[in-house]
């Protein structure tokens, strides 16, 4: 299995759950909702025969078949499904380190590339101040319209962050981008960092 690893403990736990469904041929389907976004969630669901999608990748395991959602496969790279016992019985865990990482290249639409750099380079730094920035739109032939949130909304340094940090980074990474514009209502200062 190249994209995802299912440990023996997880396999045995899932096989036991599946056997209790009294459905011959039942397997699991692994998919990510909203892959490549900050809202991505990795999911495992029962998959009765016929419920798999035509473009799913079928992975035959010892006791059952795991179906991997085609759109999710790149985001499942290096994912791990494990089962650990504890005092309460045990817990199935899914770790998918690439689930929230946008998959973009030079040919991706400009909004996807902007979101990629916001998620991977800009927001991790802003998070230390309890803030984040998101893309609202791309207008006027290459102007990124951004909105601050959290500790950045109302912050006295937002303008400096926008021009010296965010705009500079985005212009270096995305040559056809012409600039950025902030549409945040900075009069709301109750959560502001500065």
From Swiss-Prot:
The keyword 4Fe-4S applies. It comes from the Bacteria. Binds 1 [4Fe-4S] cluster per subunit. The cluster is presumably bound at the interface of two monomers. Keywords: 4Fe-4S, Iron, Iron-sulfur, Metal-binding. [4Fe-4S] cluster binds at residues 152, 155. Homodimer. Involved in iron-sulfur cluster biogenesis. Binds a 4Fe-4S cluster, can transfer this cluster to apoproteins, and thereby intervenes in the maturation of Fe/S proteins. Could also act as a scaffold/chaperone for damaged Fe/S proteins. NCBIfam families: YhgI_GntY (TIGR03341). This is Fe/S biogenesis protein NfuA. The gene is nfuA.
């Amino acid at each position: 299995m190249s994209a995802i690893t299912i440990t023996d403990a997880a396999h045995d736990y899932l096989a036991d759950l599946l056997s209790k469904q009294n459905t011959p041929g039942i397997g699991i389907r692994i998919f990510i909702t909203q892959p490549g976004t900050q809202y991505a969630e990795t999911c495992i669901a029962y998959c009765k025969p016929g419920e798999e999608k035509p473009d799913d990748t079928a992975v035959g395991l010892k006791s059952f078949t795991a179906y991997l959602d085609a759109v999710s496969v790149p985001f499942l790279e290096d994912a791990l499904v494990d089962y650990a016992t504890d005092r309460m019985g045990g817990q199935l865990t899914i770790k998918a380190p690439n689930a929230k990482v946008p998959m973009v290249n030079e040919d991706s639409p400009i909004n996807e590339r902007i979101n990629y750099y916001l998620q991977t380079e800009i927001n991790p730094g802003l998070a230390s101040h309890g803030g984040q920035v998101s893309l609202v739109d791309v207008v006027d032939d290459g102007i990124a319209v951004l909105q601050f949130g959290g500790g950045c909304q109302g912050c006295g340094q937002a303008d400096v962050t926008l021009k010296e940090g965010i705009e500079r980074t985005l212009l270096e990474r995305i040559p056809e981008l012409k600039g950025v514009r902030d549409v945040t209502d900075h009069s709301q200062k109750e959560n502001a960092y500065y």
